[in-house]
């Protein structure tokens, strides 16, 4: 082959018009250009001679020096790909379009058509079902009733009580190729549902009618998920992978679609027509359109156009590990689908968290690709800036599930003028469109002054659009069906996956291996934990203490073997959490058809086998000979093999539990339940002879039984157990008689039966894991919850009636007294000048007086210790300064914007002023109305709205406000006044319709982002503060929601409060609402501090007065212009230092004078003073915290109800398994069976309680940090509320378990024994729950808490006195027995039940003697044991409260 290529190079030379195509910068050669062209022509000629398959895999690559060489495109390295892209696209904004045009020109030259997709939807309706009103709240009662109701509905016994919730109503339209479509609409208008319907990804639970077609083909004729790409608004990624790896994996799974065939055809036609392409474009297309490449040039191209090159090799990160920023994560979500071959893109809110310039750049690059390569795109955006809005060709406006307008962007304002509405001059069209259909905002745009305004409903708009000329034209087009013969054969995909199954398996294997390397600390930690536990086990079962004389010696050996099984089995438990962590991104990839579920499941299993080998080898090598098991190398390896099988079986089982549970709390409960069943039925806790006939099937299917039998047979049929004990009446060896006494089969073949069964289980569990992944969907989808008011409002809207907003959510008596007021609302720019009746109505109710206060700060500096990474880069300073001498004054009734680019120090300045910083060095002076700031008093008069909206998820909106007002308003305010004030704030912030809505968790359920944001403002406002800080109150909101929040903020300022907002990229509207501006540049220095003026006139005048600064264009956003002209690049170009210019300006001198004036107290004023640190007494704080926790627990059935149900099922299971064993006292084994039931119940119920309480405490702790910083309460009342609420639930749990089990097992019915049983169970559950809380309180996050607590469970289990009785422990370990909480529980339970029984056993000793000799338990000591358990609970409670008070893991 090589020789042939040489021959072609020498023998044929063809001069070509390469200069037309060549980049002129390449002509810098050492030889003449002509010579180089000749040489290149030879290379091309050689390429032309190759067969097509090889020709499209080879290309001519030009190197940096200008030399060109022939390369195999599958072997391009990172540097070569980077250089190629650098030549094609040097500056993304300018060169991407040129590059795409070159690419299109090449395709057009040979007359090839690119595949295009036209998407039509006709009469599409989507309906869901929802519960209404209080029945929709997830209380323990509703949870139970709903389960029963759904079951009876399923059996058609009860009618369905859910109400229909229409999401989309009879929508029709056409999405054309080569055009960009913008989808707009207020929240809950059905945008996401429409995009999902178009992408063929609607949920199976929804009722869908109508049809969606691609090029005239119905969805069942092709694979929609691969022909189009849906980009979700949720950023679900694996945190341990880098940005480049995430994109490369996506590209590898999606393949290149039909591009390979197009490339082959293109190459064939070019060869026939004798056309030589541009070498760079040629090599790019070959590298991008060839299948089966691990690192594709498409990945690099996507990184470049999305501006992700800067973080390409940074890990994505998650809430635990710091990674890329929110904006970069959003772009990664977009890029993940753009690297694929899909020709239609449906993008859902891709701009959240991005600044307007980045959004513009991304949308522009998508637009270039759509226009030039004839793709299809529908993009929904939240707050598109005017310049981004102008990039689109078509607009779809949705409202209340109906299409109000669909057609060219140019005609949209014409339609609304035809309806009587005009967009004001300084208003973005997109913002206008989102507000004009809303009842609250519509009136301000009414233009027909001669006619009185009447609210126009969405249905009226929709009907009017059908009659409008654009609507008629659309109807005519839809009436003519698409001509299927015009559809390109490659446009729609019929193959389910992008590449071959083998390739997908390789891709998943490579990713799993990568994740294992990234998570190596987990495996190292597990090995260290195993080594530590092996060391403890070795020293506990030392050969000097281990004899082989009696069956009791055998029991200790069996205990050691059983513990080895438990340790190896529990070692697989981490698989459960690791599986669940990866599930969200797995479901996303599965639903997008990246890979079949088995390709994901197989590597997850196979790659863990080597780790199992190492872990088990550590355990067996350390313990086998030291403990003194049978000294036979064959038996050593047999134990090793068996434990490897056990570990693999356990890992498979826990992976399966993760895939079935799909949620960490549910999976933990499932996992515990299964583990419990497997262990109880394993033959150690309860011997085979004592298993009831109705449970014997459980014994035969328990994997632990096979493991227990095999490992026991391996040990007890060895030579050292082959002697007949002295005084024995039978001829059986000690080993055989011991096995028989414990109900184990004394047959050597049982080793191989056990090992075979375990291997069978390994395959079964992993197979079921793959099946669960394939068929189950994500757990706990966001549920639609409708309030009665929402239903009424929707129905009224449909009928065109107007319903009073302020009356929604009030009782009928209140409604009668309500002051009727117009729902109109002034636009924000006009509000500054005039106060309307509506505004007066808003002001009237601020019934609580407050003192207007100003805040001044002078020369504020803030520094932190220099990070190690920066020191490594050569920074020598000890401190990194984030704020450098910032000064300013914020006054009552003035709304100040705090602005600057990312990293300028906006939030830092706000945190410093509000006293929220937990570390660092602060200098400078801060005064409140002239008096030095004292943080304790300041917290009482200030509110701080954080950027992340942190609220307790299980309370309603009204309860959140009630709680805040209760704890933050002064004691003098009575309940009635407080309630009136809350109503007032709710009206001001437009929360009345949401009064009974559950807050929920962000992105999961409950309130939308915008509603959550308003709640954050309201929670601070009900505290009646004089000064309010708000950190980015409009980030992540659409224009309409941002307008509502800003209207709220403006209303707040108009009451005479001092309000400061950091703001990122405000629209003209939002910017106009501010009175003053403090502008920072990167590095924390001020550039402008002063008034904005009407339509930002003062700001514009100041900057336009600086030499070289370009004038602002008409209608351009002053905020965007200001950030552009003060950027680092502009500063460098102008040669100006804006900080210096400001410091030398008249404005600076005026500000300094103002600061000086406000820093002196007014003559009649006095300093702030409060007699107590908190506004409410300690008792009230405790009551309030308890009240909130009560609602939080009552509405958290996944925690409370599941725990009670789990206990109920375990009680029934134990009762039936250990039926009547408590009354049998003939043999030692009878007692051990009854004691085993106590041991296993204590261990599992306790661990279950401790595990499930951890996530609850972790979520509440973040809320606690916010509420404590706001001065609502101290740490002790919080700890009181958190612990007190557990007591009744634990009591219920104890009663359910205690009564059922005590009766069924048949313990002795005396009042004292029954009371002691309940007492010990109650305090055991209590200390376990407190232990779970304590571990969260002393660790930074829930994951570390889980790891630490699980390590202790293993040790507690070993030293509890059941596996090894205290009498058989070496002296040096007995101290641990005394500090192990479970040992005292077992002491109390066993001694209280059996410690005074005089019945004789078959060994001729009484039960009391056996208990004392074997366990060293005395009945007289029960009272002291009770006190010790109370003491343990108090100790854990104290550590929890102390840690919550002392440790603050929130770093600011």
From Swiss-Prot:
Distribution of this protein across tissues and organs: Expressed in root hypodermal passage cells. Expressed in stem tissues, particularly the vasculature and nodes adjacent to leaf axils.
The UniProt record lists the ABC transmembrane type-2 domain at 504-716, 1180-1394
Transmembrane stretches in the record are 521-541, 554-574, 609-629, 640-660, 664-684, 694-714, 753-773, 1199-1219, 1239-1259, 1287-1307, 1314-1334, 1344-1364, 1375-1395, 1421-1441
Q: What induces it?
A: Induced in roots by auxin, phosphate starvation, treatment with the synthetic strigolactone analog GR24, and colonization by the arbuscular mycorrhizal fungus Glomus intraradices.
- Stored Pfam families: ABC2_membrane, ABC2_membrane_7, ABC_tran, ABC_trans_N, PDR_assoc
List each copy of the ABC transporter domain by range: 152-425, 855-1107
Instruction: Name where it's found.
Output: Cell membrane
Q: Extract one GO molecular function annotation from the record.
A: ATP binding
Q: Which cysteines are joined by disulfide bonds?
A: none
Free-text disruption phenotype from the record: Enhanced branching phenotype. Defective in strigolactone exudation from roots, and reduced symbiotic interactions with arbuscular mycorrhizal fungi (AMF).
Chain segments carrying region Disordered: 808-830
**Which InterPro entries does this entry report, sorted A to Z?**
AAA+_ATPase, ABC2_TM, ABC_trans_N, ABC_transporter-like_ATP-bd, ABCG_dom, ABCG_PDR_1, ABCG_PDR_2, P-loop_NTPase
- Which SUPFAM superfamilies does the record cross-reference, listed alphabetically? P-loop containing nucleoside triphosphate hydrolases
Q: How does it sit in the membrane?
A: Multi-pass membrane protein
Function of this protein?
A: Cellular strigolactone (SL) transporter required for the exudation of SL from the root to the soil. The presence of SL in the vicinity of the roots is required for development of symbiotic interactions with arbuscular mycorrhizal fungi (AMF). Transports SL in the above ground tissues and is required for the control of shoot branching. SL regulates plant shoot architecture by inhibiting the outgrowth of axillary buds. Involved in the regulation of shootward and outward directional strigolactone transport in roots.
- Family as reported in the entry's similarity comment: Belongs to the ABC transporter superfamily. ABCG family. PDR (TC 3.A.1.205) subfamily.
Q: What is this protein called?
A: Pleiotropic drug resistance protein 1
Task: Give the species this sequence originates from.
Answer: Petunia hybrida
Q: Which gene encodes it?
A: PDR1
């Amino acid at each position: 082959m090589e020789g042939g290529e040489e021959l072609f190079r020498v023998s044929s030379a063809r001069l070509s018009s390469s200069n037309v195509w060549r980049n002129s910068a390449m002509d810098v050669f050492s030889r003449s250009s002509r010579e180089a062209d000749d040489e290149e022509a030879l290379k091309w000629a050689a390429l032309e001679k190759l067969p097509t398959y090889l020709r499209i895999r080879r290309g001519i690559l030009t190197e940096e020096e200008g030399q060109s060489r022939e390369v195999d495109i599958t072997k391009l390295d990172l540097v070569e790909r980077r250089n190629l892209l650098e030549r094609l696209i040097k500056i993304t904004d300018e060169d991407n379009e040129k590059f795409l045009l070159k690419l299109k020109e090449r395709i057009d030259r040979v007359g090839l058509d690119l595949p295009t997709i036209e998407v039509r939807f006709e009469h599409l309706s989507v309906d869901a079902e929802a519960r209404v009103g209080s029945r929709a709240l997830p209380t323990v009662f509703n949870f139970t009733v709903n389960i029963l109701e759904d079951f009876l509905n399923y059996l058609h016994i009860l009618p369905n009580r859910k109400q229909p919730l229409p999401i989309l109503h009879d929508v029709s339209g056409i999405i054309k190729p080569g055009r960009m479509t913008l989808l707009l609409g207020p929240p809950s208008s059905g945008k996401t549902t429409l995009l999902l319907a178009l992408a063929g990804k609607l949920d199976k639970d929804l009722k869908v009618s109508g049809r969606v077609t691609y090029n005239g083909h119905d969805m069942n004729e092709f694979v929609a998920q691969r022909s189009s790409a849906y980009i979700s608004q949720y950023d679900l990624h694996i945190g341990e992978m880098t940005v480049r790896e995430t994109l490369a994996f996506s590209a590898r799974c999606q393949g290149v679609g039909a591009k390979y065939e197009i490339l082959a055809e293109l190459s064939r036609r070019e060869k026939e027509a004798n056309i030589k392409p541009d070498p760079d474009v040629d090599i790019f297309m070959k590298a991008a359109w060839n299948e089966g490449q691990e690192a594709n040039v498409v990945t690099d191209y996507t990184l470049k156009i999305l501006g992700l090159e800067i973080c390409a090799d940074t890990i994505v990160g998650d809430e635990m590990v710091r990674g890329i920023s929110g904006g970069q994560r959003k772009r990664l979500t977009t890029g993940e689908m753009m690297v694929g071959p899909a020709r239609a893109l449906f993008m859902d809110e891709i701009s959240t968290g991005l600044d307007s310039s980045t959004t513009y750049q991304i949308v522009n690059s998508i637009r270039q690709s759509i226009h030039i390569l004839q793709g299809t795109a529908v993009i929904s955006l939240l707050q598109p800036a005017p310049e981004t809005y102008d990039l689109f060709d078509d607009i779809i406006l949705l409202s209340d599930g109906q299409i109000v307008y669909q057609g060219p962007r140019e005609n949209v304002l014409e339609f609304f003028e035809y309806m009587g509405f005009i967009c004001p001059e300084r208003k973005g069209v997109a913002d206008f469109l989102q507000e004009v259909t809303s009842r609250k905002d519509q009136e301000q745009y009414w233009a027909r002054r001669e006619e009185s305004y009447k609210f126009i409903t969405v249905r009226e708009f929709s009907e009017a659009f059908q009659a409008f000329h654009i609507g008629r034209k659309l109807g005519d087009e839809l009436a003519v069906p698409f001509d299927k013969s015009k559809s390109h054969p490659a446009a729609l995909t019929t193959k389910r996956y992008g590449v071959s199954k083998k390739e997908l398996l390789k891709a998943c294997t490579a990713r799993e291996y990568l994740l294992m390397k990234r998570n190596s600390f987990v495996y190292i930690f597990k090995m260290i934990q195993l080594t530590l536990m092996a060391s403890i086990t070795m020293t506990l079962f030392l050969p000097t203490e281990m004899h082989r004389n009696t069956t009791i010696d055998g029991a200790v050996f069996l205990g050691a073997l059983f513990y080895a099984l438990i340790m190896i089995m529990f070692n697989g438990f981490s698989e459960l959490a690791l599986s669940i962590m990866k599930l969200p991104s797995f479901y996303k990839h599965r639903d997008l058809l990246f890979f079949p579920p088995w390709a994901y499941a197989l590597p997850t299993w196979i790659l863990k086998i080597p780790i199992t080998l190492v872990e088990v080898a550590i355990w067996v090598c350390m313990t086998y000979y030291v403990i003194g098991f049978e000294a036979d190398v064959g038996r050593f390896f047999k134990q090793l093999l068996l434990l490897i099988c056990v570990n693999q079986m356990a890992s498979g089982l826990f992976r399966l539990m993760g895939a079935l549970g799909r949620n960490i709390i549910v999976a933990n409960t499932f996992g515990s339940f299964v583990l419990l069943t497997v262990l109880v039925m394993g033959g150690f806790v309860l011997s085979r002879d004592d298993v009831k006939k109705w449970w014997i099937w459980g014994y035969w299917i328990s994997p632990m039984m096979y493991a227990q039998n095999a490992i026991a047979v391996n040990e007890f049929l060895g030579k050292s157990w082959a002697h007949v004990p002295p005084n024995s009446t039978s001829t059986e060896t000690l080993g055989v008689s011991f096995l028989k006494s414990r109900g184990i089969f004394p047959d050597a073949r049982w080793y191989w039966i056990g090992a075979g069964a375990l291997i069978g289980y390994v395959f079964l569990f992993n197979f079921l894991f793959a099946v669960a992944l394939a068929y189950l969907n994500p757990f706990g989808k966001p549920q639609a919850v409708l309030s009665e008011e929402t239903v009424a409002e929707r129905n009224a809207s449909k009928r065109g009636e107007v319903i009073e907003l302020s009356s929604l959510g009030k009782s009928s008596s209140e409604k009668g007294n309500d002051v009727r007021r117009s729902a109109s609302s002034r636009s924000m720019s006009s509000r500054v000048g005039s106060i309307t009746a509506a505004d007066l109505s808003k002001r009237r109710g601020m019934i609580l007086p407050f003192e207007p206060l100003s805040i001044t700060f002078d020369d504020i500096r803030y520094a932190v210790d220099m990070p190690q990474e920066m020191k490594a880069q050569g920074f020598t300073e000890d401190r990194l300064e984030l704020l450098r001498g910032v000064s300013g004054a914020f006054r009552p009734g003035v709304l100040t914007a705090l602005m600057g680019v990312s990293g300028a120090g906006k939030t830092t300045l706000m945190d410093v002023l509000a006293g929220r910083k937990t570390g660092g060095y602060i200098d400078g002076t801060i005064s409140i109305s002239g008096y030095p700031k004292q943080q304790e008093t300041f917290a009482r008069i200030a509110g701080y709205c954080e950027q992340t909206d942190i609220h307790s998820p299980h309370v309603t909106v009204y309860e959140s406000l009630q709680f805040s007002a209760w704890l933050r308003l002064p004691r003098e305010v009575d309940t009635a006044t407080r309630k009136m004030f809350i109503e007032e704030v709710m009206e001001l912030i437009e929360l009345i319709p949401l009064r009974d809505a559950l807050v929920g968790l962000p992105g999961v359920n409950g309130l939308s982002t915008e509603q959550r944001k308003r709640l954050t403002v309201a929670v601070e406002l009900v505290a009646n503060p004089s000064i309010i800080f708000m950190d980015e109150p409009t980030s992540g909101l659409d224009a309409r929601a941002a307008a509502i929040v800003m209207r709220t903020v403006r209303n707040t300022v108009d009451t005479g409060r001092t309000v400061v907002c950091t703001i990122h990229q405000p629209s003209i509207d939002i910017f106009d609402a501010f009175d003053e501006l403090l502008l920072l540049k990167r590095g924390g220095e001020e550039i402008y501090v002063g008034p904005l003026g009407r339509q930002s006139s003062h700001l514009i005048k100041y900057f336009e007065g600086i030499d070289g600064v370009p004038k602002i264009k008409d209608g351009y956003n002053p905020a965007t212009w200001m950030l552009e002209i003060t950027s680092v690049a502009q500063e460098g170009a102008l040669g100006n230092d804006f900080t210096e210019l400001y410091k030398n300006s008249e404005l600076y001198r005026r500000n300094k004078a103002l600061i000086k004036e406000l820093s002196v107290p007014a003559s009649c004023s006095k300093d702030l003073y409060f007699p107590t640190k908190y506004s409410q007494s300690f008792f009230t704080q405790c009551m309030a915290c308890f009240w909130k926790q009560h609602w939080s627990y009552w509405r958290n059935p996944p925690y409370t109800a599941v725990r009670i149900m789990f206990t109920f099922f375990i009680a029934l299971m134990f009762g039936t398994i250990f039926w009547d064993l408590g009354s049998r006292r003939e043999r030692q084994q009878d007692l051990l069976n009854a004691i085993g039931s106590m041991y296993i119940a204590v261990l599992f119920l306790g661990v279950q309680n401790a595990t499930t309480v951890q996530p609850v405490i972790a979520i509440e702790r973040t809320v606690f940090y916010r509420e404590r910083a706001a001065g609502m309460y101290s740490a002790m009342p919080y700890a009181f509320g958190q612990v007190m609420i557990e007591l009744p639930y634990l009591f219920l749990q104890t009663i359910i378990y205690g009564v059922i089990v005590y009766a069924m097992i048949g313990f002795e019915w005396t009042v004292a024994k029954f009371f002691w049983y309940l007492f010990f169970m109650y305090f055991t559950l209590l200390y376990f729950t407190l232990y779970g809380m304590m571990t969260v309180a002393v660790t930074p996050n829930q994951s570390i808490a889980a790891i630490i607590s699980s390590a202790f469970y293993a040790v507690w289990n070993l030293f509890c006195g059941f596996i090894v009785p205290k009498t058989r422990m070496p002296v040096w370990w007995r101290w641990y027995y005394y500090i192990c909480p479970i040992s005292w529980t077992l002491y109390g339970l066993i001694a209280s039940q059996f410690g005074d029984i005089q019945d004789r056993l078959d060994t001729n000793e009484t039960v009391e003697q056996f208990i004392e000799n074997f366990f060293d338990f005395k009945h007289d000591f029960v009272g002291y044991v009770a006190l010790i358990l109370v003491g343990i609970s108090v100790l854990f409670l104290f550590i929890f409260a102390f840690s919550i008070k002392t440790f603050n893991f929130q770093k600011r």
